[in-house]
């Protein structure tokens, strides 16, 4: 392979940018020239980052004055409380702040209530003022107090008081509506190169250029630790036969991992039900592990709810989390059995450690 056949550094060029409506932006980008095989590597990584790791601001809770429960109705209003909440959940906002913000909706009927009637702080803007909320069919009023948060720092699921008329909304609104990529050949034979074409659709809270930039930065941050690889482990040659895992217990550990664990003590202690294959705990010397103090729990593939529960009790890094046992996790408020199992499995898969 001729490593010098690419004469210039790869670059990204915007081929097209269309605003089809307030909540639908389209962008088309080309990344070139690339070595064969690089396009699919970048395309796969950027697609996952775009669809799962780009954040935006949305409504996370709403207090509806006069509402008794989610399926109740208010006199003179066509929609039920449930329908109103669904409409609020779909409203698209634009904001640069990560701080929690408050807004209020006051409207006197009759008339149609839309997103333009929400009073917001200057740091938050509504993308589409025409988004429908409700219809008041008689001279009545509606009052809704809303809380807005960035999905990156959302904590409302755990910290909002459970008062009558307050409803928690799932912060699931993503700025990237869809993403496709295609790979095209440039040149022939030994001079063959590749071009990666990215197509991105957003909801208007961020432009296609902005989400590409944010996703790329997230990938860059993820790979930074690999630029500073150090030798944190000293391999041990012998492992006592009595302390070896059985095939069932060690099916997810390869020999290199076992050798790195070396002579560390293996503790036979039940963690999860027998069918989970997590019936052995690995006691590791945390000081000999990689520098986990600077690695956020956000790097774990766990739900936002589980992550927020951990942060609420002061667990922000992997190293802090590894000091907890499974029983300790069960004591954390709002952290259920399913979330604990999710955390235990994520720690085992990512760091080869089983919580006691």
Swiss-Prot record:
Chemical reaction(s) catalysed: RNA(n) + a ribonucleoside 5'-triphosphate = RNA(n+1) + diphosphate
UniProt EC number: 2.7.7.6
Molecular-function GO terms, alphabetical: DNA binding; DNA-directed RNA polymerase activity; protein dimerization activity
GO biological process assignments: DNA-templated transcription
Subunit architecture: In plastids the minimal PEP RNA polymerase catalytic core is composed of four subunits: alpha, beta, beta', and beta''. When a (nuclear-encoded) sigma factor is associated with the core the holoenzyme is formed, which can initiate transcription.
Gene Ontology CC annotations of this record: chloroplast; DNA-directed RNA polymerase complex; mitochondrion
Disulphide linkage map: none
Free-text comment about domains: The N-terminal domain is essential for RNAP assembly and basal transcription, whereas the C-terminal domain is involved in interaction with transcriptional regulators and with upstream promoter elements.
Protein's UniProt name: DNA-directed RNA polymerase subunit alpha
Keyword list, A-Z: Chloroplast, DNA-directed RNA polymerase, Nucleotidyltransferase, Plastid, Transcription, Transferase
Compartments, record wording: Plastid, Chloroplast
Region (Alpha C-terminal domain (alpha-CTD)): 267-356
Pfam families attached to this UniProt entry: RNA_pol_A_bac, RNA_pol_A_CTD, RNA_pol_L
Domain of life of the native organism: Eukaryota
InterPro entries: DNA-dir_RNA_pol_insert, DNA-dir_RNA_pol_RpoA/D/Rpb3, DNA-dir_RpoA, RBP11-like, RNAP_asu_C, RNApol_insert_sf
Family: Belongs to the RNA polymerase alpha chain family.
Function as written in the Swiss-Prot or TrEMBL entry: DNA-dependent RNA polymerase catalyzes the transcription of DNA into RNA using the four ribonucleoside triphosphates as substrates.
Region (Alpha N-terminal domain (alpha-NTD)): 1-230
